[in-house]
């Protein structure tokens, strides 16, 4: 029977519940347990797919095509289990499900209420999500509850967790509460009162935490931990100090050294083998002892909020670990490039344009791509970054001066990028797609396996095929591919059924390393293995750096 660990947060948001949950899961997995993780989001949106990155940060796409919270990206990077749609759900999904049941008459005319109907539905979603992993045989499911204790939005989730612990009985549920211990500079001391109040608030709901993870900018002294223990009525050994670290991959060892996994295993009556964190220690050592150093320019419109590119940043770090390279990222606002200022690109060892939506800042990205192509700077374009590379090439190499995407200009003379319902096929007919087409209507989501053209950079990187995740509405227009290929572009991967361009590159006679991909490779990169595309990209930047030295 699967046992549950609920991870809650108090005082303020953004303390790192996702990292804490993923780190604990990584330790438990190293002890031989089968683990999975779930994220419960208290907002009313059905999913984060239509939310602004400024509001929510990155949207992480699972293998089965779910648009989910960015914490699921942390989960996949820390444990071996692959997340699914059932690993993340929101208040919106819960209410939607309950209302559908009410309309179908499943509640037999009863008054539908938060308790028991909403809380029962939350419990059903949690147990269903846990059962979807490891063929229903997960030993432990860690359940992160979004928001902070005291928020009205989180109350039904906390109540559902309390009811689950009562229903399943002792030793089947544990609670880990993450809280803030701020340092007040004017007083020169850490303050424990917010933590005391947060635990008190949790107890009012009926939940007594098994362990407290106390976040601070420095290690918390034993006397302060003893004070928290006394007022929170928790053993001192269960008051865990979690201070700011320069790498999230140090957190598993930090928690393990203070015995968090032992406390949880004792609470759940589990007796697994000792933890083996040697892999994490090797990764941290590689990160702290690089032999090389490069600077990559990330050109985007969300650069003021790096949470929007969380998986991409981590993928570059993973590549650095596996190539003994410190990867510095220079964030460049694409709108600033529209009025010039290309001199900011000169010191860079490589340029990257990530995914995105909307017209704002696109011309600045195109200028950066043109600079990379003309100055032989290694370039990687992801999703929109590939589409803009095609537009730039069409304009400046294939003599289509007005080339654009119909996302930005519906009246463009050369729509080299368009919605899948807008394509013109080779016979001049309008290509039609519907919701029954592979991966849905106008939004392609989830993983798709694609063969790769032999003799290309793509084949050197991936081999015979690639299986990556998608999240986009627009595609390179097949009608223009022959002209683009005639001008020198190489389409190195296409979908097997619709023949959609998945990867493009320039031959070495035109550029040493210029690659665009329609998918999102950052979603499958892990610190354990890195990712072949990002490793090749970092190696290309190193080669360019050596050549220019």
From Swiss-Prot:
Q: What InterPro entries would the database entry show?
A: Class_I_gatase-like (IPR029062), CTP_synthase (IPR004468), CTP_synthase_N (IPR017456), GATASE (IPR017926), GATase1_CTP_Synthase (IPR033828), P-loop_NTPase (IPR027417)
Q: What is its EC number?
A: 6.3.4.2
Q: Decide whether keyword Ligase is in the record.
A: yes
Binding-site positions, ATP: 14-19, 71
- In the record, what terms sit under GO molecular function? ATP binding; CTP synthase activity; glutaminase activity; identical protein binding; metal ion binding
The pathway it acts in is: Pyrimidine metabolism; CTP biosynthesis via de novo pathway; CTP from UDP: step 2/2
Annotated binding of CTP, by residue: 13, 151-153, 191-196, 227
Q: How activity is regulated?
A: Allosterically activated by GTP, when glutamine is the substrate; GTP has no effect on the reaction when ammonia is the substrate. The allosteric effector GTP functions by stabilizing the protein conformation that binds the tetrahedral intermediate(s) formed during glutamine hydrolysis. Inhibited by the product CTP, via allosteric rather than competitive inhibition.
State the source organism's domain of life. Bacteria
Q: Known SUPFAM superfamilies for this protein?
A: Class I glutamine amidotransferase-like, P-loop containing nucleoside triphosphate hydrolases
Supply one GO CC term from the record.
cytosol
Q: Which reaction does it catalyse?
A: UTP + L-glutamine + ATP + H2O = CTP + L-glutamate + ADP + phosphate + 2 H(+); L-glutamine + H2O = L-glutamate + NH4(+); UTP + NH4(+) + ATP = CTP + ADP + phosphate + 2 H(+)
Q: Where does Mg(2+) bind?
A: 71, 144
Catalytic center at which residues? Answer: 383, 520, 522
CDD domains assigned: CTPS_N, GATase1_CTP_Synthase
Q: What does this protein do?
A: Catalyzes the ATP-dependent amination of UTP to CTP with either L-glutamine or ammonia as the source of nitrogen. Regulates intracellular CTP levels through interactions with the four ribonucleotide triphosphates.
- Mention any additional remark: CTPSs have evolved a hybrid strategy for distinguishing between UTP and CTP. The overlapping regions of the product feedback inhibitory and substrate sites recognize a common feature in both compounds, the triphosphate moiety. To differentiate isosteric substrate and product pyrimidine rings, an additional pocket far from the expected kinase/ligase catalytic site, specifically recognizes the cytosine and ribose portions of the product inhibitor.
The identity of this protein, by name, is CTP synthase
Name of the encoding gene: pyrG
């Amino acid at each position: 029977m699967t046992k549950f660990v609920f991870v809650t947060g108090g005082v303020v948001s953004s303390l790192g519940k996702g990292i804490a949950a993923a780190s604990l899961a990584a330790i438990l997995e190293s002890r031989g347990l089968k683990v999975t993780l779930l994220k419960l989001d208290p907002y009313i949106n059905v999913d984060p797919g239509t939310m602004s990155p400024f509001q929510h940060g990155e949207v992480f796409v699972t293998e089965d095509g779910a648009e989910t919270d960015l914490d699921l990206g942390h989960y996949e990077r820390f444990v071996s289990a692959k997340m699914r749609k059932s690993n993340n759900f929101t208040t919106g999904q819960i209410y939607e499900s309950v209302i559908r049941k009410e309309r179908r008459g499943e509640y037999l005319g009863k008054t539908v209420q938060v308790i028991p109907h909403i809380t029962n539905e939350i419990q059903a979603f949690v147990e269903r999500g846990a059962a979807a992993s490891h063929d229903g045989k997960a030993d432990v499911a860690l359940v992160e509850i979004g928001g902070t204790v005291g928020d009205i939005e989180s109350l039904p989730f906390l109540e559902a967790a309390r009811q689950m612990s009562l229903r399943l009985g002792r030793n089947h549920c544990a609670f880990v509460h993450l809280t803030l211990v701020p340092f007040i500079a004017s007083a020169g001391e850490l303050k424990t009162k917010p933590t005391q109040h947060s635990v008190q608030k949790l107890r009012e709901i009926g939940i007594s935490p098994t362990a407290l993870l106390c976040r601070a900018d420095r290690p918390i002294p034993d006397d302060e931990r003893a004070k928290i223990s006394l007022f929170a009525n928790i053993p001192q050994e269960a008051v865990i100090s979690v201070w700011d670290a320069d790498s999230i991959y140090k957190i598993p060892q930090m928690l393990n050294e203070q015995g968090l996994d032992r406390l949880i295993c004792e609470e759940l009556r589990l007796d697994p083998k000792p933890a083996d964190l040697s892999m994490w220690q090797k990764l941290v050592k590689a990160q702290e002892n690089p032999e090389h150093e490069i600077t990559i320019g990330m050109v985007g419109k969300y650069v003021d909020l790096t949470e929007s590119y969380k998986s991409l940043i981590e993928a570059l770090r993973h590549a650095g670990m596996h190539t003994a390279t410190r990867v510095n990222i220079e964030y460049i606002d694409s709108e600033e490039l529209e009025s010039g200022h290309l001199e900011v690109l000169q010191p860079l060892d490589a340029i990257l344009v990530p995914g995105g939506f909307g017209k704002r800042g696109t011309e600045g990205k195109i200028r950066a791509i043109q600079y990379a192509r003309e100055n032989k700077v290694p370039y990687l374009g992801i999703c929109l970054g590939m589409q803009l590379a095609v537009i730039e090439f069409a304009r400046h190499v294939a003599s289509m001066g007005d080339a654009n995407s119909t996302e930005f200009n519906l009246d463009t003379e050369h729509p080299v990028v368009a919605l899948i319902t807008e394509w013109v096929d080779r016979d001049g007919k309008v290509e039609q797609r519907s919701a029954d087409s592979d991966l849905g209507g106008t939004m392609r989501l989830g993983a798709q396996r694609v063969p790769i053209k032999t003799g290309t950079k793509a084949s050197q990187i991936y081999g015979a095929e690639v299986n990556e995740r998608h999240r986009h509405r627009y595609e390179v227009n097949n009608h223009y591919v022959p002209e683009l290929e005639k001008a020198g572009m190489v389409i190195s991967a296409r979908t097997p059924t619709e023949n959609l361009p998945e990867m493009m590159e320039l031959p070495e006679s035109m550029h040493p390393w210029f690659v665009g991909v329609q998918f999102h490779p950052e979603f499958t990169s892990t610190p354990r293995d890195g990712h072949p595309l990002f490793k090749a990209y970092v190696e290309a930047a190193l080669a360019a750096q050596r050549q220019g030295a």
